[in-house]
Regions:
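Short hydrophobic/aromatic helix or loop-helix immediately within or flanking a transmembrane segment
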Residues: 39-46, 57-82
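Short acidic/glycine- and proline-prone juxtamembrane loop motifs at membrane-interface regions
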Residues: 128-136
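Hydrophobic/aromatic-rich transmembrane helices and adjacent perimembrane loops
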Residues: 298-324
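Short periplasmic/luminal acceptor-recognition loop of GT-C membrane glycosyltransferases, typified by
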Residues: 350, 360-444, 449-465
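Transmembrane-helix motifs of polytopic, lipid-linked glycan transferases
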Residues: 88-108
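Membrane-interface transmembrane helices that cradle and orient dolichyl/undecaprenyl
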Residues: 143-158
Length: 495
């Protein structure tokens, strides 16, 4: 038994090592929103001492259920380089859901099957840079595993830890708190079905756990925020159960999705595995909420996608096989290896774009303002069809939209697309830069930029500069061009 335990722990360490290995390949991984979040953490770490950044931004702390990165990264940036801290937070976003999945599965009697979670570790939400969400889901799974282990044997310990952990989850990301509620709610529902007389006692325990987060939400900046909910067509919603596995090769992604969903399904049919009652109830609740949830609400997008990702982790957290056919085990191991090799290759190639971008940003001085423009996917579809695979996921989601944030991080220059929603980020843009940001709105394509009012900016930074010829020379003067990127001085700011 001791030898088996040692082998299991070594395998877990090996899995974690393989999963974080890509972070040693490139210093700015191609995660869509990540450069934007890193820039905000860099600003928070630099204020109030950096007088240049203080012209652009000011801290704006309030009760916000989306603060994991903002609380973790700035203190670390006082002792470690910014890109090291950034990759540490990505490592946390990768490993916490993996460790939480393993912990949950072992709490319900599983062991080796949970290691298959490596197939969903690099899911669509992680690759789109939703780090706070990913961290919070990992913490939710870890807390839920403790709840399952201790709820009956040591109820005070289980409830006490949950009461402390729930506000922490609220601070990390609200969706993590919702995930935790559904996981332990599923466990309690299972017990109530078995012992109906315990419904009041268990209901009061859940109320005590979520009382503090409910009070925090009622006074948070998110609570009064309005906005109509947006829903995807039902077919598109269901398709998200596959697209959560999206990486860089569609055929491989579909094979991974088929294996991750197919093995537990076949295990149930042929009775070589089971989904214990607490996990089954939790997965049922997650499925119901996924079907009912909007795609967008209160300024947050991909809401239902996040529940699909939670279900993806539960495929490995909630299934306990008596045995897994060797062909399935070998097949999943090969899929994992292929997925990780492809990811490492893609991330290594991404360094080409980073080198181009840094080369053209060299003339930018601290305190200057940089207008960023990109090649729209509809503006030049042929370019995107032939585009290098590191700039978009297999489902077409582009990943380079926020690379302009490097102008802020590495050149201490202003860029107009910093996330600063009061309900989601503890930072605000100062005037006159707030007015500049409002004037630009979204990241423009070249058709928009050619006639845009760019008064107030010093430069135009072009991403995908190899997609188009130079813009009008009477307005924009080329200073530097290097493959993916180009920098232009502004000679006539009004079109």
């Amino acid at each position: 038994m001791l030898r088996t335990d040692r082998t299991w722990w070594l395998a877990l360490v090996g899995l974690c090592a393989v999963l974080v290995a890509p972070l040693f390949v490139v210093d700015v991984p191609p995660l869509l929103d990540y450069p934007n979040h890193l820039a905000r953490a860099f600003v928070l770490a630099s204020l109030p001492d950096d007088t240049i950044l203080a012209r652009f931004y000011a801290p704006h702390w309030s009760i916000i259920p989306n603060l994991a990165l903002d609380l973790l990264a700035p203190p670390l940036m006082h002792v470690l380089p910014v890109h090291v801290v950034g990759r540490l937070t990505i490592a946390a976003a990768i490993l916490l859901p993996v460790l939480g999945t393993v912990a949950y599965n072992t709490a319900i009697g599983g062991r080796w099957w949970s290691f298959g979670v490596g197939l969903v570790a690099y899911n669509t939400c992680l690759l789109q840079g939703f780090l706070n969400f990913s961290i919070s889901v990992g913490v939710a799974l870890l807390l839920a595993s403790c709840w399952l282990r201790w709820r009956e044997a040591r109820p005070r310990r289980a409830i006490g830890l949950a009461i402390v952990g729930a506000p922490v989850l609220f601070a990390c990301h609200l969706m993590g708190l919702v995930c935790f509620g559904l996981l332990i709610g599923g466990g309690e529902l299972c017990r109530v079905v078995q012992t109906p007389s315990s419904i009041v006692r268990r209901g009061l325990a859940l109320l005590s756990v979520f009382a503090a987060p409910a009070a925090l939400y009622s006074i948070s900046a998110l609570q009064p925020l309005g906005g109509d909910a947006e829903f995807l067509p039902f077919g598109d919603k269901l398709f998200q159960l596959v697209t959560i596995f999206s990486n860089y090769d569609w055929a491989l992604d579909v094979a991974v999705a088929a294996a991750a969903m197919g093995v537990p399904a076949l295990g149930q049919v042929f009775r070589w595995g089971r989904v214990p009652c607490p996990a089954a109830c939790a997965m049922g609740l997650l499925a119901i909420v996924f079907l009912a949830a909007p795609y967008a609400w209160k300024g947050t997008y991909l809401l239902d996608t996040r529940f699909a990702v939670m279900l993806g982790f539960m495929l490995f957290a909630g299934f306990v096989p008596n045995r897994v056919p060797p062909i399935a085990s070998v097949g999943m191991a090969l899929l994992f290896a292929a997925r990780m090799v492809l990811l490492v290759v893609v991330w290594a190639d991404h360094r080409i774009d980073l080198t181009d971008l840094r080369r053209v940003l060299a003339p930018v001085q601290p305190g200057q303002a940089v207008y960023v423009v990109e090649a729209g996917q509809q503006e030049n579809p042929a370019y995107w069809t032939a585009n290098p695979h590191w700039r978009a996921l297999s489902d077409g989601t582009r990943l380079d939209e926020h690379l302009g944030a490097l102008a802020l991080i590495e050149r201490r220059a202003y860029w107009p697309f910093q996330f600063d929603m009061p309900s989601q980020q503890p930072i605000q843009t100062r005037e006159p830069y707030r007015k500049l940001s409002g004037k630009v709105g979204h990241v423009p394509d070249w058709a928009e930029a050619a006639v845009a009012d760019v008064c107030g900016f010093d430069y135009v930074l072009s991403l995908e500069a190899d997609a188009f010829p130079d813009p009008p020379a009477r307005r924009f003067r080329l200073l530097a061009r290097s493959g993916f990127a180009a920098l232009y001085a502004i000679d006539a700011c009004a079109g």
